[in-house]
Amino acid sequence: MSQHIRAGVSKIEITCKEEGTYDDCLSEKAKKHIPAEYLSTKLIVDDPLFARVLVLDDGSEKVVWITMDVTAIGARTISQNILSDSADNFMPDLRKQIEKEFNIPGCNVCVSASHTHQAPRLLCDDAAQINRILEAIKSALQNMAPVVIGVGSGYENTITVNRTIMMKNGTDHTLSPFPPENEIEGLRPIDPEIGILRIDRLDGNPFAVVYNFASHLLLGSPQGNSGHITADHVGVTLKYLENNLGGETIAFFLQGAGGDINEIFGTDSNNRRRTVDFGTKLGQSILKGYQKIITGPVKIRMVVKNIAFPFRTDIPNYITALKQEQAALTASLNTAYAHLLSFKEFLPLYLKYALNPDYPSHLSFRYLRAAECGDNSIKEEDDRNRLEIKKYLDRIKTMEQMTRNELKISMLKKHQEVIDEIGTPTIPAEIQGVKIGECVFITAPMEILTEVGFDVKKMSPFKHTYIASISNGYLHYAPPASYYRRGGYEVTECLLAPAWEDIFYNVVKNIFDELKK
């Protein structure tokens, strides 16, 4: 066996070149989940999408890791064709071809999605995706070179936020509209760690770099556009790294435990540089960590476990409870015979009482003179107006809650339809453990949440451990079991029963045990 591991890298464009609108590329089943006003949006490519290939071979183990600028892998059926880019049979078909053409075991192939999702169609057609990836693998294998590898961490805590808002009533909130500030308990944490794999040629020149970070790719294109085909901020960071490291360096991104993590710039809709700012800031933080990493010879090991996760069975009861709440909220709006302000009446009244709470209706001398005379008419007028303002605001709050509930009902119905269509109580999943020196990546076909990512790191006997989410398939969100009763977005947008978590931790522990041997 050679003293040094050998590596090969390559990348190839896989961007959709079709013209048309969202309406042209969405199935009828998918369209019912998309607001009608979006269907006329044109497909526009703002920046290219790539498949990137990293091959590692230490003489006894060979691993092929493919990263793709796409929302998810093999997600058509499970998303009702909303995430239509990657066919259900993409993974088995690709692995079969890799085994046939390159004699590399399919189980040693990992495909990870970046999770960019600005447009409903991102990639070239199914056959072209596989053919181009095979071409990229061939190129990587033809350019294998001895390398040294090091692993380390970067730190970036200023550009992401956990989007789950914990409420004082024990629930979780994510969906718009935003809740009243006085009802908020706090935010869940982020993981600021950036996992960094540094791969150098034997002469010390950069060969490749891999970074792992939790984010959600919701910013849009570097040009400042939303809804266009784009690699989002990941494309900016990868380009930044490649330009700064120079030569023929290829950079790779692996999605972390980012299921509940958003970019903090996501609400800055007027900042057209937000994607560039995010990607550049993250790239700078990666390079800070990269410079501290010491490289050397390493060995690689891979462990693959095939398991089954149970589907949730509580959706019908969940929908029933939400509909009962909707009925009660609707009944609360029945204010027959009561005086109700129109918006035209409400807005000027609200502004008056917000701008000058002490003297809203008249100049202050009128209030002072009324007090001297014992005249309560102005106070009574203010009390009536404040009551009308409160009634109007209460109705808005009620309708906001009804909007959230309708969104939840819609999502839950969609997932129940998927579960019914699949027709089995469980769904298969593949979990991989890839050990590169003292670094271990745990892959998962779900959008893993931050708390689960923290737990995996705590469980690990290895110095550096990272989650590579949305790999080798797609099973939507995977929240901790304790979150289900809190009813947050990731729980609502979830197919899996709470028991998935213990199953996952058990298989991860088994992987760690095998990798230690």
Model feature map: region roles:
Residues 1-517:
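Non-catalytic substrate/cofactor recognition surfaces at enzyme active-site rims
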